[in-house]
């Protein structure tokens, strides 16, 4: 066939989709990462240079800074933080309907031209970028930053056939607490703890508040409607 390259972005590529493409078409899906404000690619795996679980290396000519996030440490030899970039592909700014003809530069720190992605990433010792989640999709529990997306992945590992979504709510003892919404009525803390032990992680990733739903609310794109779930907290 003529199909040579398949690149996935927008959300994390599941292992089941990756395996299905290899089995059916013999093609490895290459995962990438970007933003509309960056026209739109920031990092991508290539056929010759790829690492599973990452979104590849930053494109050439992209300067980057990882701003420290309190409660979030990096493994030895790696870097972790909130990603800011400066590059030729970063837009000049936004055109607002209510202010025609005026370019509103993106928020930045330091020199103009920087763009704050709003994403927390980890860059490993070989320069591969690993997306850990949106800043707004982290909770600070007992002083430690916990990725709500990573907690969702944990739920998927414990219950592959269910649908799961995680939010956080204020907690007097720990600052914030996890709330897991799931369509699997049999999913409990014991199965989540087992998944942590099997795949690695922290006890802080195990939700104490687990709520069963017949179906999770979704947007027109098929993604989870977190705004609707927040109304249930």
Language-model-detected regions and their locations in the chain:
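A structural signal for short hydrophobic beta-strand segments in well-ordered beta-sheet cores
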Residues: 64-66, 101-108, 119-123, 166
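Beta-strand->loop->alpha-helix junctions that form or flank phosphate-binding loops
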Residues: 30-37, 41, 56-58, 167-170, ...
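Short proline/glycine- and acidic-rich turn/helix-capping motifs at secondary-structure junctions
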Residues: 172-173, 209-221
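Gly/Ser/Thr-rich phosphate-binding loop
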Residues: 1-51, 63, 70
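Short beta-strand-to-turn element immediately C-terminal to the catalytic PLP-Schiff-base lysine
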Residues: 42-46, 67, 86, 97, ...
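Conserved ATP/PPi-binding loop(s) of AMP-dependent carboxylate-activating enzymes
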Residues: 57-61, 72-107, 144-146
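AMP-binding/adenylate-forming catalytic core of the ANL superfamily
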Residues: 87, 92-93, 113, 118-205, ...
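Active-site glycine-centered loops adjacent to acidic/histidine catalytic or metal-binding residues
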Residues: 10, 34, 56, 119, ...
């Amino acid at each position: 066939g003529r199909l040579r390259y398949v690149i996935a972005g927008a959300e994390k590529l599941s292992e089941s989709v990756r395996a299905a493409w290899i089995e059916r078409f013999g093609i490895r899906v290459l995962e990438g990462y970007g933003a509309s404000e960056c026209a739109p690619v920031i990092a991508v795996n290539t056929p010759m240079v790829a690492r599973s679980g990452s979104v590849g290396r930053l494109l050439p000519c992209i300067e980057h800074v990882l701003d420290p996030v309190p409660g979030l440490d990096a493994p030895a030899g790696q870097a972790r933080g909130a990603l800011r970039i400066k590059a030729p592909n970063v837009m000049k700014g936004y055109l607002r309907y209510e202010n025609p003809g005026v370019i509103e530069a993106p928020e930045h720190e330091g020199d103009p031209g920087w763009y704050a992605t709003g994403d927390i990433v980890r860059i490993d010792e070989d320069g591969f970028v690993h997306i850990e989640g949106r800043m707004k999709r982290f909770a600070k529990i007992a002083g430690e930053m916990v990725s709500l997306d990573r907690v969702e992945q944990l739920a998927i590992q414990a219950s592959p056939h269910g649908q799961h979504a995680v939010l956080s709510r204020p907690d007097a003892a720990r600052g914030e607490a996890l709330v897991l919404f799931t369509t699997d009525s049999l999913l409990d803390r014991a199965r989540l703890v087992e998944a942590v032990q099997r795949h690695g992680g922290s006890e802080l990733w195990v939700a104490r508040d687990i709520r069963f739903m017949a179906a999770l609310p979704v947007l027109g794109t098929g993604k989870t409607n977190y705004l609707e779930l927040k109304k249930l907290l």
